[in-house]
């Protein structure tokens, strides 16, 4: 079951973060952050694995150990060394997003997939 809205705790406030506003989720130093299409960055309180299970697979892809990316955020794909791919998103990212050679076919199939009827 995927969540439509995540409640994000920022200091003494709780901010409702809509799933469709998320461009990517990123983990570094055991902390997960979400970046919106407007470039806002929010601290999240679960692991990347937990969010992966809460986000619809059709709309979000686990690119690597650090990133889950939204389909709408992918603007360009570049072929990189060793048959890997790098993703360029609609928003800036803290580091290069690399898709491993082994995951390239899965990523391409995901990107080509037609949205299932709801």
Model-derived regions, located:
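Eukaryotic intrinsically disordered, low-complexity regulatory linkers and tails enriched in Ser/Thr/Pro
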Residues: 1-11, 101-118
């Amino acid at each position: 079951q995927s969540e439509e809205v995540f409640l994000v705790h920022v200091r003494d406030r709780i901010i409702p973060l809509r799933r469709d506003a998320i461009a990517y989720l990123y983990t570094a130093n055991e902390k997960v952050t979400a970046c919106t299409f407007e470039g806002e960055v929010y601290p999240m309180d679960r692991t990347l694995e937990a969010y992966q299970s809460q986000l619809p697979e059709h709309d979000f892809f686990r690119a690597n150990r650090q990133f889950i990316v939204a389909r709408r955020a992918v603007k360009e794909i570049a072929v990189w060394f060793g048959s890997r791919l790098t993703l360029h998103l609609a928003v800036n990212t803290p580091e290069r997003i690399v898709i491993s050679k082994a995951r390239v076919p899965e990523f391409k199939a995901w990107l080509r997939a037609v949205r299932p009827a709801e």
